[in-house]
Amino acid sequence: MRCRGRPARDMIPDMSDTTERTTRVPDEGPIEQLSEEERRTRRWERRRSAARSARRVLARSGLQGTIRGRLASLDAAGEVYDLDESVDVYGNGVVEALERKVAGLLGTEAAAFFPTGTMAQQVALRCWAGRSGNPAVALHALGHPEVHERDAFSRVSGLRPVQLTGEPRQPTAQEVRDCPEPFGALMLELPLRDAGYLLPSWEELNELVEAARERDAVVHFDGARLWESTVHFGRPLDEIAGLADSVYVSFYKSLDGFGGAALAGPATLVEEAKTWRHRYGGQVFQQFPTALSALLGLERELPRLPEYVRHARVVAAALREALAEAGLPWSRVHPEVPHTNEFQVWLPYDADVVAEAAIRTAEETGTLLFGRAWDGTVPGLARTEVDVRASGLEWSAEDVRAAVADFVVRLREEAGRVHG
C-alpha cells in the first residue's frame, strides 16, 4: 500500500505534450558535431516535415500545420457562431457561448474558459481546498500535475499532492480508502496518459468516487481527453461528468483547437474560479480565434471521436500482429485493446534508432506510421504514442501491416548501422 506526498515520478518515462524543442537548428555540419539538444531539434524538424508531406498518416493535428493552414481552419467558423457579432472583451461574447456549450455537453450548471488546463486545475483545486480547509490532493504519481507542471500545485497554489500509487494503472478504491492521511480532493486523470491512456471500468470509476465520498473528499476529473472516453465507459459525457464535483476539459488535444480549456461544475464554484482566473492572469483581452476553434472542434471532431476510438482498436491489433510476424524479439502495444483513440507502442531498441527508422520510412515511402517522439529513458527500450484520427480511418488492417513491414526493414538497417 502506498500513499504519500511525493516524489516517485518516472515510473514511466516522461513524454510531455511539449517535450521536444522547436527552436530551429541549421542543417549545416555533420550530425556528429551537434549537441544532443540540436540533434533532437533537427529530428523534430524532419519528423514535422515528413508529417506534412506524407501521403498517408494515422492522424493529422494542428501541431504539424502551418500558420496559414491553421488560420484557414477558421473559414468555417460562421457555421458555429455569428461572425457579425462583436468581438469578445475579457471573456464575454463568443467565450461565454463556448462556456454555455461546454456546460450543456457535460451536464453541469456552468463552465469557465481558461487559457490553459494547468491554470484551470490549480484554480479548481484551490477553490475546493478553500471550502474544505484541506489543501491535500490525492492523485496518481503519473498524473499531469506531478509529471508535467514543474510542481505548480505546491509552488504556486499552496496545494499538497498525496500520491495514491505509482503503478502504471488507475488507482483503486481500496487505495483511496487506505490512504493514511486526510485529503480534501481526489483528482482522477481520465484517461491516465502516461500509463497508456488508461481508463478504469465504469464500475471501478463509481467505486473510486464512492471511496472519496467515504473520505469526505470532493472529486475532480482531469478530463483533458475525457471527450474520447464515452466508448470505453459506454456512457454519455454528461453521465460520466456527473460523477465528479468538477471537471476540466481541453480544447486543443482531441478537438484540435488552437488552445484553451474549460472548468465545469456548480455555478458557485465556477463563479469563484473566474475570480481566481483573473488573479492568475487568465483574464485575456480577446480570445475569439481560440474560442471559435474550440466551437468548431465540438461541432466537427467531437461527434467523430467514437469512430476514431473504434478504429484505433483495429490499428492496434494489426500493429501487434505485424510486429510479431516481423520476428522482433520483444514488442508491445499497450493496452492491447485501446481505451481511447491513443495508445502506446514499445520496441526493444534504442530510441534514436527507432526514431530514425520511423522518419526514414515516412521520407522514403510517403507513409507515416509513427508520427510522435520516441522516449528512451530506459536504455534499449523505446516508447511512443499512436494517435488515430480522421486520416487514420482510411487505413485497413492490411495497410497497417504493410507500413509495419516497411518500417521494420529500416529499423533493422539502422540497428545494424549503429551496432556494426
Residue ranges and their predicted role:
Residues 102, 120, 153, 186, ...:
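Buried hydrophobic positions in well-ordered alpha/beta secondary-structure cores of metabolic enzymes
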Residues 169-224, 228:
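Active-site phosphate-binding strand-loop segment of PLP-dependent enzymes
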Residues 160-161, 219-220, 369:
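Hydrophobic beta-strand scaffold residues
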Residues 16, 24-40, 326-420:
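Conserved C-terminal alpha-helix-loop-beta "cap" of PLP-dependent enzymes
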Residues 111-118, 250-251, 286:
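Active-site nucleophile and cofactor-binding loops and adjacent substrate-binding regions
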Residues 38-116, 130, 141-147, 152-154, ...:
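Conserved N-terminal alpha-helix of the aminotransferase class I/II PLP-enzyme fold
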Residues 37-38, 194, 199, 242-349, ...:
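Active-site C-terminal subdomain of aminotransferase-like
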Residues 129-185:
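PLP-dependent aminotransferase-like
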